[in-house]
């Protein structure tokens, strides 16, 4: 099924793909008249990724019917990284088994990427009984993960009324990032009960890679439960992660 999809701002799209490529090697993108979606798990089955890009965020979206295209994420990332912030990204597929990627700026550069067979995973995002919901600025989360990586391979999230703490403890060092609603970095917090859970720093570092400093990031978690993290792409698109907890001894 042929299609032509245009996205203004190639670099922003590239950042999305780079974030996912840090966690998965290949992906099956479902292209429908409503938009583009992708769901995948990392090889260790610790992180579930769910991407949803409605047709409304694209400047041109000509799709007739439905098709699933499989791509090597590393190859796709490398091509998209050649785009500049003001470049226009054009995705086309004809009858051949290739994805055509054009980057339109001071010149038009076109790449042809072979499509591959990728098994689609039939995994639903579980409806978990989260006891804490926290909304923070992307900059705060990115810096906290960087700080934690200096001292430990895990970071503990703790939420109670009007307070969210991210803490990492190593053998000789520790770091704590504390936020209340009086701080600019904490935008909202809803807590049903005092909640604590730990997560792997390396996975979080990959998950936050594509988040902008001013992006609003929503995290939902429970005691020793998976954490759901999501942020919006141009208000209507959404990238969601589900990260398994690090159960401490």
Swiss-Prot record:
PROSITE patterns: PCNA_1. One of its GO terms (biological process) is leading strand elongation. Keywords: DNA replication, DNA-binding. InterPro entries: DNA_clamp_sf, Pr_cel_nuc_antig, Pr_cel_nuc_antig_C, Pr_cel_nuc_antig_CS, Pr_cel_nuc_antig_N. One of its GO terms (molecular function) is DNA binding. Disulfide bonds: none annotated. It holds the Pfam family PCNA_C. Belongs to the PCNA family. Sliding clamp subunit that acts as a moving platform for DNA processing. Responsible for tethering the catalytic subunit of DNA polymerase and other proteins to DNA during high-speed replication. PANTHER family: PROLIFERATING CELL NUCLEAR ANTIGEN. Homotrimer. The subunits circularize to form a toroid; DNA passes through its center. Replication factor C (RFC) is required to load the toroid on the DNA. NCBIfam families: pcna, PRK01115.1-2, PRK01115.1-4. This is DNA polymerase sliding clamp. The lineage of its organism: Archaea, Methanobacteriati, Methanobacteriota, Thermococci, Thermococcales.
């Amino acid at each position: 099924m042929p299609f032509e999809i245009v996205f203004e701002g190639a670099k922003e799209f590239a950042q999305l793909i780079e974030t996912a490529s840090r966690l998965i090697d290949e992906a099956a993108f479902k292209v429908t008249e409503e938009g583009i979606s992708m769901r995948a798990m990392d090889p260790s089955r610790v992180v579930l990724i769910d991407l949803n890009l409605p047709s409304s965020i694209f400047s041109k979206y000509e799709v007739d019917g439905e098709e699933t295209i499989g791509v090597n994420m590393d190859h796709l990332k490398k091509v998209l990284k050649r785009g500049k912030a003001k470049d226009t990204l054009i995705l086309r597929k004809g009858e051949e088994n290739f994805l055509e990627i054009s980057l339109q700026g001071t010149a038009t550069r076109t790449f042809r990427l072979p499509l591959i067979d990728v098994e689609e995973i039939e995994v639903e995002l579980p409806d978990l009984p989260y006891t804490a919901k926290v909304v923070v600025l992307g900059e705060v989360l990115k810096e906290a993960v960087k700080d934690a990586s200096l001292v430990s391979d895990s970071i503990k999230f703790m939420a109670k009324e009007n307070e969210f703490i991210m803490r990492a403890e190593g053998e000789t060092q520790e770091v704590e990032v504390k936020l209340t609603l009086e701080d600019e970095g904490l935008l909202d917090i809803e807590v049903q009960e005092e909640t604590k859970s730990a997560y792997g720093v390396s996975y979080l570092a990959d998950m936050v890679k594509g988040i902008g400093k001013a992006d609003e990031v929503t995290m939902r978690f429970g005691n020793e439960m998976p954490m759901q993290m999501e942020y919006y792409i141009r208000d209507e698109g959404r990238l969601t992660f589900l990260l398994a907890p690090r159960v401490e001894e």
